[in-house]
Design a protein with these regions (language model features):
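Nucleotide-sugar donor-binding/catalytic module of glycosyltransferases
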Residues: 1-103
């Protein structure tokens, strides 16, 4: 099972491009775990809207009650993943379409 884990914080400017690069992979992950670290912009609602339009993946979306910072938020997100193989990515990454396949 392949999981992708994303930690977000105020990433409204880039998050859609990152999510598109995940759903366009030649090998689709079994799940995508996204944990938002108390964004004060529209990141969370943008992700919710994206998920509604792209339901072919098992999405797991969470929002922290308090800001943990990037390192603790990634640890938190990884703990929620169920995959044997876990890819981590930042909210402003854009993946090559064959990233999962090549890895």
């Amino acid at each position: 099972m392949i999981s992708v884990v994303i930690s977000t914080y105020n990433g409204e400017k880039y998050i859609v491009q990152q999510l598109l690069s995940i759903v366009q992979q030649t090998i689709i992950p079994n799940e995508v775990v996204i944990v938002d670290d108390c964004s004060t912009d529209n990141t969370f609602s943008i992700i919710e809207n994206f998920i509604e339009k792209h339901n072919g993946i098992n999405w797991k979306l969470f929002r922290n009650d308090i800001n943990l910072g990037w390192k603790k938020n990634f640890i938190n997100a990884i703990s929620k993943a169920e995959g044997d193989i876990i890819f981590t990515c930042d909210q402003d990454d854009v993946w090559n379409k064959q990233k999962i396949e090549i890895m």
